[in-house]
């Protein structure tokens, strides 16, 4: 009887190890380890509004004539295909303009110097200079409603910051895979600003 219990415990422990390993594997597949990728700039904490400087960089950009929230899957697919085809390392975050719909992916420093990138499907390479944004950090699902609510909040917040003025339209910043569980997702809304 004691031998039977030991055998059951051993089998149970093995099952537990399998479940943990399976979860870790699924976590990797669905973006739970997204923060392991190289980040183009620091994340704004959830619920925080701040002004931050984004570095100059080289981007891959996909564009659409329609609004982003109608076209986002097509934009992500085109960018992902370009990343895979050119064997470019993944980075975070991905930025998305709303009207017209755009999605941009930051190239890592080594890939930014490459001259052999093959870009198709309307994906283009673009250089950006250092810029300043007002940012609000968000935790939760990626939706048009979340974007609109937080765009309103960051517009109201920047009015309380002496000397700072908006110089562009708000856009959304995604830190995690679209497949990540909604309540773990992190994002931001940025509003380009200038002091003067």
For the regions a protein language model found, what residue spans apply to each?
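A solvent-exposed interaction/effector surface
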Residues: 2-196
């Amino acid at each position: 009887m004691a031998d039977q219990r030991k055998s059951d415990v051993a089998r149970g422990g093995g099952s537990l190890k399998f479940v943990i390993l399976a979860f870790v594997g699924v976590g990797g597949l669905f973006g739970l380890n997204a923060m392991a990728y190289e980040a183009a700039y620091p994340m704004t904490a959830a619920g925080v509004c701040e002004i931050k400087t984004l570095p100059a960089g080289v981007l891959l950009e996909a564009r659409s004539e329609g609004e982003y929230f109608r076209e986002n899957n097509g934009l992500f697919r085109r960018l992902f295909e370009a990343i895979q085809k050119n064997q470019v390392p993944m980075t975070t975050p991905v930025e998305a303009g709303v009207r017209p719909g755009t999605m941009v992916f930051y190239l890592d420093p080594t890939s930014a110097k490459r001259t052999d990138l093959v870009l198709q499907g309307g994906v283009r390479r673009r250089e950006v200079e250092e810029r300043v944004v007002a940012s609000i950090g968000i935790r939760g699902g990626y939706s048009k409603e979340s974007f609109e609510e937080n765009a309103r909040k960051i517009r109201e917040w920047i009015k309380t910051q002496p000397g700072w003025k908006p110089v562009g339209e708000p856009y959304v910043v995604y830190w995690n895979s679209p497949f990540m569980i909604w309540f773990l997702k992190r994002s931001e809304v940025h509003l380009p600003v200038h002091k003067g």
